[in-house]
Amino acid sequence: MLLQAQRLEQQGKLPEAERLYQQAIQLAGSSPLAAEAQLRLAALYMRKMERYDDALKIYEQLIKQYRTGEIAAEATLRMGELYERQMQKTADQKERNALEQKALEAYRRLENDFRDTAVAKGEGKQRLEALLRRIDERNRNHPAYLFWDVLVALTGRQPWLSYWVAIVLFTLIVLALLTPLRVAWFRSFREMKKLEPEVRRLRERYKGQELNEKIMELYKQHKVNPAAGCLPMLIQMPILIYVFYAIRLYEYQFSKGFFLWINPSLAERFPGIVGANLGQHDLPLLVLYAISLYITQRLTPVSDPAQAEQMKMMSLFMTVFMLYMMYLWRFPSAFVLYWFVSNILMTAQQLRYMKVEPEPAAPLATTTNPPEPAPAAASSNPGKNHHTRKPRRKR
């Protein structure tokens, strides 16, 4: 029946071929023959009938049903091909970019989750390489791409040296740009730290709204803005997002670079754990990043001692969350290396600033009461009666 459907497809009788494929799927039940018929039907929808949504549903169903093995790998590969075909059919640049990213994700998933299949080693690898080259060609004139290229060229484009050194240099440059913001944050923290003893005294004397008013009065007296420490952190976010974008622009070139254990030799011995290059995911580097993140979070100073335990739990939560998300999304090791180096440098910077002990602040100025009268001076001879006798009146 499949051969007959193929002949009808070659003759251009697409509706008849579609019906035969559907009949073959029903007759085959849950056997591998049904999966083959589904793949052929989805290919018919995608390549000749342009029914992309119908084809996508079949591919998603096959991936969910088979999970691993050649059938799921084939469905993943064809899903990437489908997105590329859709990309060629649209003129909207925003939509093209979104479809291109979906195709890249499908090929990346094929490379990571189905690396031992013939599909991943053959056509999947070729399609991923071709797509990355096209993206790289398009990005070559972007300022961030050119900047990366200059950093790599400084050390001669050596695979074992140039690319990770470029990441370290890039991290130093970004940290230098962020240093004024971080210094402002530490200054704000120091001012808050100086006021801690006085804030504790206010907490002992006042409650509720009156306490808040007294604390704000104290901050105003010492010209401290409690929200000033948050502003530098908020300003950093757009910069960090751009850093991620800049690394993604140069992702294809990073696949030519290695770092210590991240190389093809060890990747073959430990597949799925060690990355073959800086463009691939690497688990040991991700674990090192998570450890550095936890240490950085724990060393972040807290102005209020009552928040110390809460900060400890938040540090642990953030570490586990970031570890899970970066593992799930299979971030390229070039990006993880940037974060790892950045955490080390920021931790060193924090330790340097934390060595300086803040001086205690002056107490809150209050209205002074008039001094109480001094007690009467005691007699110099405590053994005698303090009350003097009146002299007797003469009669």
Enumerate the language-model features and the residues they cover:
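Helix-loop-helix
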Residues: 10, 47-48, 57, 61-65, ...
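Structural signature of tandem alpha-helical TPR/SEL1-like repeats
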Residues: 13-19, 36, 50-57, 92-94, ...
